């Protein structure tokens, strides 16, 4: 006759397996964090985001007051003062939608190379007439070795339904 199966031992081994998988996920997250946010790479730089304004694509100009709330029908863009940054750093500016998709941006380049690109609009998705509702994040990042290593400016915008 076979010995009865110890169910506590099975549960214990299952728990150990879950703990091992959890540790692997934690270690992978820490490695990713250290890769994209290397220790000692914080410079204290701050990009000057002048504001987020309604955008006129025909004139490539911004109008109206600085805002963080827009209707779906309004195009909007960020205005950045690149002269507030040292000329030897490499930066880029990007718009991210609620899904994390890049929906506009410039760079990476040095601030003097971006001097004529102070207005960074959000692009309407192909096949659509209006911007999708949700949160949009505008981020200015410092690059080193071809990798973004520091966020030096950010603004959050809400597009209403």
Model-identified regions with their sequence ranges:
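Ser/Thr/Pro/Gly-rich low-complexity linker/stalk segments immediately outside membranes or between
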Residues: 33-51
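Conserved aromatic beta-strand anchor motif in extracellular beta-sandwich/beta-rich domains
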Residues: 93-97, 140-142
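Short, solvent-exposed, Trp/other aromatic-anchored flexible loops in extracytoplasmic proteins
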Residues: 111-137, 144
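N-terminal Lys/Arg-rich, disordered targeting/topogenic segments
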Residues: 1-12
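Solvent-exposed serine/threonine-rich low-complexity stretches and specific carbohydrate-binding patches
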Residues: 102-115, 153-156
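Hydrophobic membrane-insertion alpha-helices, especially the h-region
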Residues: 14-33
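Short beta-strand elements
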Residues: 82, 147-161
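Contiguous beta-strand segments within globular domains
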Residues: 51-87
